[in-house]
Amino acid sequence: MSIAITLVCNKGGVGRSTTAQNVGWRLAKSNYKVLIVDLDSQANTSITLCKDYEALVITAKKSITEMLKSNDKYFTDYIVPTRHKNLDLLASSWELDMTESMIRNESSPNTQLRDRLDVVCEDKYDFIIYDTPPRKTDKFIHNALIISNYYWYIVSSENRWALDAKPIMDKTIKDVTESMGARIQPIPALITLYRRRNALSTLVVEQCKKIFDYGIMKATIRDTTEMRKSSAMYQTIYEYNHRAEVAKDYTKATEELIVTLRATQTKLKL
């Protein structure tokens, strides 16, 4: 059985998709089988990771939207490969916004993904990572949280609004656990876009220590030109420059993630 993690934050631009891509890639490099489910209609994660996004996703009609349009199809039927042999993708497209409106009219709008997550898929992967959009009302966030074991809050140290939005996400998670029966645990928050010796970054880190009662990770992801260049080239930082300092940051964060999960998961093979 796989371990499912949903990345959350109500604010855009905090590095949620970048984290999904690079942590997923680093886990794959460590010989874990990983599936990333891209639930953001911007499809940045899908375009970055997919071997040939236009051919394999758009032309072949293998996206989450196409899966949800069908009545008898499952995750396994729509998974596409990435450039890493251990990392697969359930891709997004610009149509996902319209799909979100569509599933609101279903009799069970919050379990559309759960109903299509097949046993074959769960048994194949060690990790399933859900990359979510920033909108608090998005049904895909509810869908992801319901079938996840953990949620992981991503915070940008250059944007105080990411912290101000936390109570809204806390309410979403409370609703999902109390009203929808989800059993989900927090992972210590990850701070991204960190600038050393920067007053705002220092302030945000100190605020995070107070606000997140389940803690923050020791690892931080620094804000670097190389990270921005790798994103512009539609590559993970490990492909663009695996020796970069920010690549080391993501490696530390991934290792810390595994240690955290080891403490709570008996089924994780380490």
Regions inferred by a protein language model and the residue ranges of each:
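P-loop NTP-binding core
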Residues: M1-L270
